[in-house]
Regions:
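Patatin-like phospholipase
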Residues: 1-41, 49-272
Length: 272
């Protein structure tokens, strides 16, 4: 589509719930909506990165299914995390190799938490894609931190789980996909039978506090998940398919309310 406005896509973190992002992308492709610039945190960085280099939504779903996070040989015995982040980088290397963010066909911004300074870091576009994505996805306590240029990084979601502000001024129309549930408060839970469950709960509480204001920055904010029925680390392929479908249906349902807005912003676009 020529002479169109630029469209941005902000993707939040959420572990395997990030497959809802891929479902949204499937719907956007069917509507001939082309994304020009992407920002992603954690799972959003994974999905956004894969899409930015040309992977189709179905291929993104297959990638998630192929990653065996909790395989015994991924365990970390000498690093600060249950799992060795280098093992995840190996998965990413198959797709990205030595590609840098600047080499992507689509403009991509990825954030992580700098453990040394305690501040949010949006990586230079000359950072290797596999390293930036792994750093942004290094869930604290689960994955070991990722070192880039002498600094240690972990999950960007700690400080900014929904990075809409990063590209707000870099596009004309901003679509956001926020995997936070539509519940306004953190749902009470009493099931803490493992270290992993405690860590996940602590991060859930923290992330809940830093996403609300970002929704308002989007011209169209999609909220695929209505409850906490799905885990951050799903292992069932059937449930992964369900999450993908939830993203697709949420985008489909919300599209009618923004169709006119999109057409007005870009009269030359051929939206179905």
């Amino acid at each position: 589509m020529n002479n169109k406005v630029s469209i941005g896509l902000a993707l939040s973190g959420g572990g395997h719930k990030g497959l809802a992002h891929a479902g949204v992308l499937q719907f956007l492709e069917e509507q001939n909506i082309q994304i020009d610039v992407i920002s992603g945190t954690s799972a959003g960085a994974i999905v956004g990165g894969l899409y930015a280099v040309g992977k189709k939504p179905a291929e993104i779903l297959d990638f998630f299914k192929s990653v065996k996070l909790f395989s015994w040989n991924h365990l970390s015995f000498s690093k600060a995390g249950l799992l060795d982040a280098e093992k995840f980088i190996d998965y990413l290397d198959v797709v990205f190799g030595e590609t840098k963010l600047v080499d992507f066909p689509k403009e991509m911004y990825i954030s992580a938490t700098d453990i040394n300074s305690g501040r949010l870091k949006t990586f230079s576009r000359y950072t290797k894609a596999k390293e930036a994505i792994a750093a942004s996805s290094a869930f604290p306590g689960i994955f070991s931190p990722v070192q880039i240029e002498g600094r240690l990084y972990c999950d960007g979601g700690i400080l900014a789980n929904f990075p809409a502000n990063i590209i707000q001024g870099r596009c004309d129309f901003l679509i956001g996909v926020n995997l936070d549930t539509q519940e306004t408060t953190v749902k009470e839970s009493k099931e803490f039978s493992s270290i992993k469950s405690v860590v996940l709960r602590a991060i859930e509480i923290m992330m809940k506090q830093n996403v609300a204001t970002q929704d308002n920055l989007c011209d169209w904010c999609i909220l695929p998940l209505k409850s906490t029925d799905y885990s951050t680390f799903e292992t069932s392929k059937d449930r992964m398919d369900e999450i993908f479908h939830l993203g697709y249906e949420a985008a489909k349902k919300g599209f009618e309310t923004v169709r006119k807005k999109l057409i007005k912003a870009n009269k030359s676009a051929d939206y179905k």
